Design a protein with these regions (language model features):
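Key DNA-contact positions within bacterial/archaeal DNA-binding proteins
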Residues: 20, 31, 60
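Short amphipathic helical patch at the helix-1/turn junction of helix-turn-helix
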Residues: 2, 13, 41-42
Length: 66
């Protein structure tokens, strides 16, 4: 089975956004952001779309199969 990898931490750091701020902006907990960044949790389709919109990127630019 293929796993989903993401670039959320890299993008967040590049944009100088804290986990707390990103969580607040996306209306999720900081723990959710941590889990997604560490590939311990795959976001729902809705949250993945929100994250892509947040960074003004396509989903496939953030999430990839490894």
């Amino acid at each position: 089975m293929m796993a989903v990898k993401n670039k959320i931490k890299e993008l967040r750091v590049q944009h100088k956004i804290t986990q707390v701020q990103m969580a607040k902006d996306l209306q999720v907990t900081r723990q959710t952001i941590v889990a997604i960044e560490n590939n311990h949790y795959n976001p729902s389709l809705e949250l993945a779309l929100k994250i892509a919109h947040y960074f003004d990127l396509k989903m496939e630019d953030i999430f990839t199969l490894k």
